[in-house]
Structures are given as C-alpha cells and as structure tokens.
Amino acid sequence: MNKKLKDVLLKLDQDLIKHVKGSLDLEISGVTYSSKLVLPRYVFFALPGIRFDGHDFIETAIQKGSNVIVCSRDMDFYSPNVTYIKVDDFNIRKFMSNFSNIFYDEPSKKLKVIGVTGTDGKSSVCYYIYLLLKKKGVKVGFISTVFFDDGNGSLIKNPYRQSTPESTEIHLFLSNMVKNNVQYAILESTSHGLDLKTARLIDVNYFAVVFTNIGHEHLEFHGTIQNYLNAKLGLFRSVSDDAGFGVINFDDPYYSDFKNAVKKSFTYSLKSSKADFFVSFIDEKIDSTRFEFYHKGVKYFANVSLLGSFNVENIMAALILVSQILNSDIQDIVDKLICIKSLDGRMDSVNLGQNFSVIIDYAHTPGAFSKLFPIFKRFATNRLISVFGSAGERDVAKRFLQGQIADIYSDLIVLCDEDPRGENSMYIIKDIAKGIVNKVVNQDLFFIPDRRLAIEKAISLARAGDLVVALGKGHENSIIYKNKELFWNEQEAVKNAILSLEESEKDR
C-alpha cells in the first residue's frame, strides 16, 4: 500500500501536529514503531517507553529506509530527504493510531467489529464466537491473546506478548481482513488497549461488544479499580451504530455501569432469572458440561465438551452475541455448540498414562483462581497440588489473594516464576506466601523460582489419584526476566517431568 504523506496528514487532527520539517510530497508505504520492522519509505514513530526510547533508534530507522520520522522532541541533527513531524509526548500514541487508521483506509468501518473485554474469559469468548460464526458459514477474523486469523482461514499464534497489539498492527491486521472479504472481526479488547495512554484501540469502530467480569488485575497500570473500570467502559461507550449492542454478565457487581454505557444490551446470568438469559441448571463432568437456560420463557438444553461453570458463562456470552448479530434462532446456535473446543492453555489435560492427573491453565488472577480451584478440588480424587507464581512489575495486591485462594483448596503448593521481569523472584514468591497460612515451608509449601524445577517437584510429589495443576502460563511461549526472555512450553515441561519421574521409578 502506497500513499502520499500529504494526503494522510490532511485527514488528521492538525492540532496534534506541533511542527513539520521537510517535504510533505513523499510517498510512504508503511507505518511502524519498531526499527526492526522498518522497510523503505516507512513512517517511523519514535515512541517514548519505560525501558527503551524510540528516539534512540531514529538513525537506525533512517538507515533502513524510513523517510518520515514522527518524534516528540527536537533533534540534534536532521537527515536530508527525511521529513520530521513533531508532536507532544502525550499525543504521540494517539497520533500514531489516527495516522495508521487513515493510512489503511479506516478498515474497521468496512467490517462489523466485535469487542470483548473483562478481566477473565476474554480469549475464550473471542475463540467461541469465532468458532460459532465459522460454523454458520460466516467469513470471520480475530485477534486475541492466543491466536490471530486475518480471514485467510488459518490460525496463527499471537506473535506478541500483548493481548492487544499496538495501533499500527491493529489497523494493518484489520486492513488484511478487509482484503480477505471478512464480514466480522473479533478483537480481544484489553484495558491496556482501551486506555487513552496507549491509544491502541481509539480509532476502532465497534459494532457489538461483550463484558465478562471485573476482577483484581492491572492496577499497577491503571492505579485504581475505577480507572480500570473506566477503561473497559470506554469500549461500550464507543458503540455508536444504532444497530449495535452489548452483551453483559448480569452477575458482575459492575453490571449496571456497562448496561448504562450502551443503548441496547442483552444480559446473561448463572444466578438470577432477571437476566435476559438465565442458566438454571449445570451438570459438570470431567470432560463435558451439560446445562439448561431460559430466554423469554423458553427452556433450552445445551451440552459442551468443556469443563466448568465459568465456561458456561463464556459460552453464554458467545451464544448470545452470535444469535443477535446474525439474528439467528437460539436453538440453531445451541445446536452448533458441538463445534466449541478448548483454547490452547485453557484446562489442558496432560495424560501420558500416569496414575495421577495434570491440568494446565492460563489462570493468573484472583477471579480466575476463585472459579477454578473449587472445580479442581471437586475432581481431585485424592490430593490437589498447585504450581503457580505471579507476574513481576504488575498488580502486587493480587499476590496475597492468589495465595489465599490456593491455600484454601490445595493440599500442596509449589510457588515459582511466572514472569518476574525486573523483580526479584523470591520477593514475589514471599508476597504470595503471605496469603498462605495453613501450610509449612518445605513440608506442604515449596519455594522454587525455576519453573521447570518447580513442575518437576510437583510431579515428583504426586501420588495415585492426585491432581496437579500448573497455572499462569498456559499457551505462553516465554518467561520474562529483567534482561532476557526464556523460551517456555508448559506442555513440554509437564510431559518431561512425568517422563523423568517414570524413568527414575524404573531405576529403583
């Protein structure tokens, strides 16, 4: 895609631009904030950051062919034949989003975009909506923590550690969806992505939105629960189309805030018949869940190959969204639930023939813990052994809560790294341990920062009938430390630990 710089700038808010040095009559072919991704005639945005400053990479970007630099401070040296656009620090991300949206011809306006937000369940709801729409024969694309599909029909793993990528990537991906004749685009819309500080999603035109729940997460970024809530409410307030609507979890304490933020909405509940869709019965088995729900006085019977009442919530959100967006008969969508399958890293069972069970899950918040641990305890025929950590440089207050919940349900706990980042691993582990009051260190509570060794320890402790749960990493392919990222595969780590245990038992 090629455009004239002046044609893009003419459509942008001129108040955001402080100064332009150089020609506007340049041809540009791409937009990026990463010097690693720069190609000839790319616009390079020098974003200020926590660890790195994009201004330090301007010369690298120019050497690789960038002919337009967007910066927030004056340069000591200006390269000839390069145009410099100066904006405020505070506005540079907003300007990048505006610019990307215009450069890619406002792709979200050519799609019906579905946004899913909430503390827990976002990725699963996105995936279930994706599967149901595909089952209905609809051309669909999506962006989530785990997978991307730009409409070419194949899933690729999310190449970023961000659930919601930067605006340059969002609009490029939406543009590819338009090229692939996608009708519906599903975006996992995180609070980080919705926040005006990152401005990743401010230029996305949403048609329908889903709210799953609000829990204790990301307060290190938002500061207060109210700021966190407001970021998510922004998604609902952005639905401008008169035909647009929201799907809301009636059981969440903040339900009314979301209902008031959108003109039209549908609610679901596992507790109250006042909701538009009320789940009246749930029967959980180890490999499936049967449930019944009412809508407008009609009773529906559903069965899915997933475990847990929390998954019933996620299924209901997806079912309602798809039935309403397609104006389909409810029973028709219920019949399609056979296509629903678990997302990678969500309630993944690892069975190599061992006499105990192992489950891997991405759960990393107190809300997710409070939903999953009762299920784990119920299906553990003997002891429950949990392995988990908590993210470094993230919400500190949740660590105590994670430990407290795990302590109630677990017989043995092994604490380890999740993503320590710049924090000391043992400091994080000891923060979690403050919530664990019913265990004794080195008897039924173990501090092993190295996640591989921690999993090996948990597996070595397992007896017949035990359930070992490894939480917090799920699908993720790395563990982040201060100065490095360690490749990680939770499935492989668990499998190797089981195989090592079997080998050691043979040698006895």
Swiss-Prot record:
Its main location: cytoplasm. GO terms for biological process: cell division; cell wall organization; peptidoglycan biosynthetic process; regulation of cell shape. Pathway: Cell wall biogenesis; peptidoglycan biosynthesis. UDP-N-acetyl-alpha-D-muramoyl-L-alanyl-D-glutamate binds at S35, S163, T164, T190, R200. NCBIfam families: murE, PRK00139.1-4. The keyword Cell cycle applies. The modification N6-carboxylysine is found at K232. Pfam families: Mur_ligase, Mur_ligase_C, Mur_ligase_M. ATP binds at G118, T119, D120, G121, K122, S123, S124. It is an enzyme of class 6 (ligase). This is UDP-N-acetylmuramyl-tripeptide synthetase. The keyword Cell wall biogenesis/degradation applies. InterPro entries: Mur-like_cat_sf, Mur_ligase_C, Mur_ligase_C_dom_sf, Mur_ligase_cen, Mur_ligase_N, MurE/MurF_N, UDP-N-AcMur-Glu-dNH2Pim_ligase. PANTHER family: MUR LIGASE FAMILY MEMBER, UDP-N-ACETYLMURAMOYL-L-ALANYL-D-GLUTAMATE--2,6-DIAMINOPIMELATE LIGASE MURE HOMOLOG, CHLOROPLASTIC. Catalyzes the addition of an amino acid to the nucleotide precursor UDP-N-acetylmuramoyl-L-alanyl-D-glutamate (UMAG) in the biosynthesis of bacterial cell-wall peptidoglycan. Keywords: ATP-binding, Cell cycle, Cell division, Cell shape, Cell wall biogenesis/degradation, Cytoplasm, Ligase, Nucleotide-binding, Peptidoglycan synthesis. Its EC number is 6.3.2.-. It comes from Borrelia garinii subsp. bavariensis (strain ATCC BAA-2496 / DSM 23469 / PBi) (Borreliella bavariensis). Belongs to the MurCDEF family. MurE subfamily. It is found in: Cytoplasm. GO terms for molecular function: acid-amino acid ligase activity; ATP binding; magnesium ion binding. GO terms for cellular component: cytoplasm. Carboxylation is probably crucial for Mg(2+) binding and, consequently, for the gamma-phosphate positioning of ATP.
